[in-house]
């Protein structure tokens, strides 16, 4: 973190300035000579303009370039600390001014003659000449700048640029107006030479700040309308008449102001720091004293391409004292680093730490003073936080208990009874009672920071390893003023540390948390779009991630199997689709979808929270549910009923649902899920069907009923998310497919086909669903989403259908695969509520929610829907067919609502609902069971997407992509998911967003769903075998949905990134599609964008989905996202993602996808879009995710399990161990060259290699 040597910079500046002084005359002369040549060549009718332009631009650019660096050097030199002498500066400025004016006077004469000669030339030529002059002036500026005072140079540059500009304008004017030209030119020239002109003054003020800008503007001026120019010139002329004295005074005042600003800027302290990453690599960056830790964190997240998460923290490790502290977001980084000693071994580490905001994720564990951890409904958590932080004063938790206090200078510890109060920490002296008058102030918190001690059992013979340290930030060595306390267990440690933080920072902590939440959400909108979307394949992975091992394994297993069969059928479908899309439907629809999705996503975002539970329902409702509206909630469904509108509705409901899901996830997904599953189990089911009908509207209603339930709905979607899962499930899907069958004819040609085929099966599955319902975590299978595998059809279908039939068998497998990946444990638990918790960590709320659902495993949701409306389901399926995917959608939703959740808790996450949509075809099939949903059949436009979207409905396109093409993408997203999960709270948030997108999608997709049912059949067959797994992923997807499904849906879900839903969605879809070029073609137009934005696109995605292979390819393409997963949870990612990847991977690699003609349709456009989005969000996501996943283990520890840094942290070890061997080089100040960044690359690379 050493600062660069100022002397070196100063020398460079001095040399430059000397040369500059000498060269100024030469430069001007040379330029004028050039001008003469130019005019001559212009006279000879050869159009030189085009040729000259590029060189001109290059000149200007070079000038700007050098300008930028010289300014940087000057600032650095000033930075060295010496205060700048204003008088000396002004003297420099004046001397330069004089020099320029003398030079200018000569030049102006020359120029006048030139202008005369040129007057006859056409305007265009003048412009050219004008441009050249400009370039010349800018280059001369460059030189001038360095000369003299650093600031004066700046001003000079600005002046020169302005002058050149004015000269150009004058030249032009001269052409247009014969009489004025001469005068104008003269004036301008003079100005450029050094005389003051109005234009110049302004230019100096602006241009001094950014000569680059002015240069650019001057360049642009060339392109400005020639007619407009003259008028501008006239205005300038009118202004120029001001007397020279006035002008000089103005100019001088302006210069002084600029110089003062620069001086101020130059005196800002800047530090070059080295930040160590959790993967043992490190990054070097410059920070200035005005930057907060939050800003630096945002910077690092961008640079390291890791997914956004609340848990990313900057950790200060004081190796000499073996302690570490997580910097608070509002703190000033430079201030803290300046406390380090010059020879300090301290390190700055960028890593995920769940302890940072665990306080806000589970406030009941920290604010109530209870000894045991407890679950609490999200709403109650919010109320608790508001009571504590939003009142007139902050309520400091009254923590008290026995702690061990270290004796000064000894390695002995004694027990004392300590109490935390707002004013500080107190203790009861030996032999005294706990009476307020006997309390002794241990210390006040104003000037001390709280640190975690590391390995004090060895260092200080502490009774336990749970130590906290209180010291003044400037104490860097051993001191009697450092207080060491030891707790009996990790829970007590975290309670004390967080209590002290609350007492010290108060409301600022809560504000930091909300700010971080906003950033993460907005980032997720983006990433969910690009990376998530891109990673639709990933998304399945992500679900697996949630479930962790199970889902991973099963996923990969399923993926492998399904891919072949599904890939083939999918590729065929995708080809058909791609052709159809190529015909033009794609583009039109995608644009429409995009717009819709954009509008809807936001909508969904808003309602999400409450709707979450409904999300699932909404989907259901969306599909066939219309009839089912029976449930009162359906009222909202009414909107869904209109099949055409449904898509919108879906988006609405979906969005809400999605949003809701996210919320849950964020807060206490597990709790919510559990509650939801329990209450919702029963409640949910009925509502779900109704919801399905109302779908979009109802979703919200659903949520309310369940309150907690919201999370459950998402679970169903998970299946979808696990595109991989879905793929895997395809076989199982077959059974469930029937349900999905409904999927969506909308799917477009290809999807429709799939769905149609599957449709028949659909009916049967529904019954099964009911049976397996509860038991089967398999419900997940419902999610099965194998449909996704199948591409999109299967995923959705599987979701519903699978659960029923395969449910029992599949459940296990499914569970496993389903997104167990990340939360394998949850998977098994899926059925039971417990699962949710496991999932929760990773899967986020969704997972958690599903657990509640567990009562009624995913199947239960689906089953509930199915059982409730088993008969209807079938008919609904038919309806859904007409409606399209909606049914599918619905089904997924409903499972997510509660059932799915339980099983897939992790993946079940409500969000998944949306995921299903991606595999519209399947979802259609699946939804058939929830035929009610079919009703909403979203609008056909989205169908293609819709079908996949069904689940997602809103994000049909996305969904589809998720399932099929998206699937490919999804995989990458999955990593993201992982990261999300890892972040847990952070991730959760994002996920929720996705759900909203999903919701939107689902709205749109429903049509696809209903339509697709029959189509779904095709994929289903393949899926059936893997339904279980797929389902899992599907179910998980919901939870993951946010991750996996979301990925796929991401675009749609982008909702996941709440905002992004709208914004990001559109980009994501692109990225999503691009990944699976072949599929993309089909899905791309519709899905890509629509997916992101709305179900509309979904259809396209759907196309992609159908082809598992595509997914794989996509995955490859999105490999970067995969990388992310790698980071996140290498295992999880690898397993889940890999398995899914095979299926979805295709999607990512566009090239691989190419086979899918569909993608090829818009290869260019989508590819580009995807690429950029991918690059931006995916890479960011990917790396983040991978990183996150790595950290995940820690994060997983839910709450504050974070164990104190391991012994590695010990001073010596720490160096080597913490950051890895490099870390030892962790010095905050960067002494040597910046560390090599290659590792990060891998993230980006992540691609699908693995």
From Swiss-Prot:
Modification sites for Phosphothreonine: 830, 974
Positions of post-translational Phosphotyrosine modification: 426, 456, 1226
Basic and acidic residues compositional bias, start-end: 588-597, 1238-1250
Residues that bear N-acetylmethionine: 1
Start and end residues of each Ras-associating domain: 269-355
GO cellular component terms given for this protein: cytoskeleton; cytosol; filopodium; lamellipodium; nuclear body; plasma membrane
Tissue: Isoform RMO1-RAPH1 is ubiquitously expressed with highest levels in brain, heart, ovary and developing embryo. Isoform RMO1 is widely expressed with highest levels in liver. Low expression in B-cells.
InterPro entries: GRB/APBB1IP, PH-like_dom_sf, PH_APBB1IP, PH_domain, RA_dom, Ubiquitin-like_domsf
Topology relative to the membrane: Peripheral membrane protein
Induction data: Reduced expression in metastatic osteosarcomas compared to primary osteosarcoma tumors. Down-regulated in both breast (43% of tissue samples) and ovarian (25% of tissue samples) cancers.
Sites of Phosphoserine modification: 5, 17, 54, 150, 192, 203, 205, 610, 827, 845, 853, 894, 965, 996, 1012, 1183
Ranges of compositional bias, category Acidic residues: 1-23
Biased composition (Polar residues): 552-570, 976-986, 1131-1144, 1151-1161
Pfam families named among the record's database cross-references: PH, RA_2
Biased composition (Low complexity): 202-217, 535-551, 651-662, 791-802, 948-968
UniProtKB keywords: Acetylation, Cell membrane, Cell projection, Cytoplasm, Cytoskeleton, Membrane, Phosphoprotein
CDD domains named in the record: PH_APBB1IP, RA_MRL_Lpd
PH domain: residues covered: 396-505
Gene3D superfamilies: Phosphatidylinositol 3-kinase Catalytic Subunit, Chain A, domain 1, Pleckstrin-homology domain (PH domain)/Phosphotyrosine-binding domain (PTB)
Compartments, as annotated in UniProt: Cell membrane; Cell projection, Lamellipodium; Cell projection, Filopodium; Cytoplasm, Cytoskeleton
Region Disordered, annotated ranges: 1-26, 179-217, 535-570, 588-663, 675-1036, 1050-1162, 1176-1250
Alphabetical GO biological process terms: axon extension; signal transduction
Family in the record: Belongs to the MRL family.
Subunit structure: Interacts with EVL and VASP and targets them to the leading edge. Interacts (via Ras associating and PH domains) with RAC1.
Record function comment: Mediator of localized membrane signals. Implicated in the regulation of lamellipodial dynamics. Negatively regulates cell adhesion.
Name the record gives this protein: Ras-associated and pleckstrin homology domains-containing protein 1
Native organism taxonomy: Eukaryota, Metazoa, Chordata, Craniata, Vertebrata
Gene behind the chain: RAPH1
